[in-house]
Amino acid sequence: MKPYPKGDDKGWPGWQFPATDQEYPGANPDPLFHAKYLHELYFKADPEYKGRYSVPVLWDTQTDTIVNNESAELLRDLQTGFNSILPESDAGITLYPEQLREKIDEVSDWMQRDLNTGVYKAGFARTQEDYDSNVPVVFAALNKLEKMIHANGGPYVLGKDLTELDVRAYATVVRFDTVYVQHFKCNLGTIRHDYPQINNWLKNLYWNVEGFKETTDFRHIKENYTKSHGDINPLAITPMGPWPAVEEGWQPQVEKIRVGGVMMPKVLELEAELGP
């Protein structure tokens, strides 16, 4: 999909497919139906559809319909949904290992609510009061994540095992300094300056773990926000920085890195409410 334009303030006509591979690098035409708009697929699946035309979308070519469009569910379902056609070695790979499921579920709850969704609550606030109440929540979650990575010894959120939590956190953290600090005004701190543990974790995923860098396109990320939200950025000017988008220099020994955080009293109060 092209990151912009997405249409009017009600989302019509919504996400567009490029006509060719060259129209917008990194965005591909619809290979199944050659649709121009994503909404065409929603109406193909259900002619009476009344909801939003959102991504991601998982289309089943056997039943010829959308089977899921919820990212959290897809993150879980794709781990096992195709095991029957995968080699045994690949079918055994999981980001939701049984021994860590209770902890993953516990962390996922506040991470989704306060961090993944939290940046949008802050960024789309319509009043100063709403903005002021939502921004500290985001940084309380980042403070907690910072300490968790350090306490578990890295290189991942829960220690030596790559889990769903790393995927969930990455999607927000990799965008944070690039988009959320300026576009959503989440500017109490930055990942690279205020969260050295998270920054080190990000460096490892982006530069060392296959699949993360390859699926991250900073032009798409920036233009998806800066050229789509006319009420926030009416001139649609896209900032150049930060540079580099993700720093290099991963330190495998997390104990050698200081534990950072935003020390604003309201942030610390909300962090404490998240528990130990």
Residue ranges and their predicted role:
Residues 1-276:
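C-terminal alpha-helical interaction module
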